[in-house]
UniProtKB/Swiss-Prot annotation:
Residues given in the record as substrate binding sites: N73, H79, D86, L100, S101, R110
HAMAP family named among the record's database cross-references: AroQ
Originating organism: Sulfurovum sp. (strain NBC37-1)
Protein name from the UniProt record: 3-dehydroquinate dehydratase
Reaction(s) catalysed by this chain's protein: 3-dehydroquinate = 3-dehydroshikimate + H2O
Keywords per UniProt: Amino-acid biosynthesis, Aromatic amino acid biosynthesis, Lyase
Site (Transition state stabilizer): residue numbering on this chain: R17
Length: 162
């Protein structure tokens, strides 16, 4: 199974910008930890970061037929991007939204996520550990999806034998 991790604007600056909010860990280090989890759990993982909304939309759309789930930190686009929201809704893949900081404790304009309503879940305020939680959550979601598909296949096979 394959998970695509999509990182939004300014996340390439982690470890440099606003460490009091986002912490000292660099994006590469977060990805290294996620890759380790993926390897331990026999998952394929791919990382993508862009500061451009259209590139993020393109990558989400490219997940059709290529990925089983998406973990996304849309960063500032969380609060403004109908395009990213619509792309996630269109691909119909399990998606988890992650934020390093607790967006609900920050400036009022950050409180509303346009993305969350089309996601399976949202993890906020856990720092880099939030990505680990997202990996655990996505692993569970994908296992449940696989089990449901297996049950459906068995039911179809049984119905065809009758």
């Amino acid at each position: 199974m394959k998970i695509v991790v999509i990182q939004g604007p300014n996340l390439n600056m982690l470890g440099i910008r606003e460490q009091n909010i986002y912490g000292p860990m660099k994006l590469e280090d977060i990805h290294k930890q996620m890759k380790g989890f993926a390897e331990q759990n026999k998952l394929e993982i791919e990382f993508f970061q862009s500061n451009l909304e259209g590139e993020i939309v393109d990558r989400i759309q490219e997940c059709i037929g290529d990925a089983d789930g998406i973990i996304i930190n849309p960063a500032a686009y969380t609060h403004t991007s109908i395009a990213i929201r619509d792309a996630i809704a269109a691909v119909q893949l399990p998606t988890l939204e992650v934020h390093l900081s607790n967006i609900h404790q920050r400036e009022e304009f950050r409180h509303k996520s346009l993305i969350a309503p089309v996601c399976a879940g949202q993890i906020v305020g856990m720092g880099p550990f939030g990505y680990h939680l997202a990996m655990v959550g996505m692993t569970q979601i994908l296992s449940e999806v696989a089990a449901m598909r297996e049950q459906q296949a068995k039911a179809q096979a049984a119905a065809q034998q009758k």
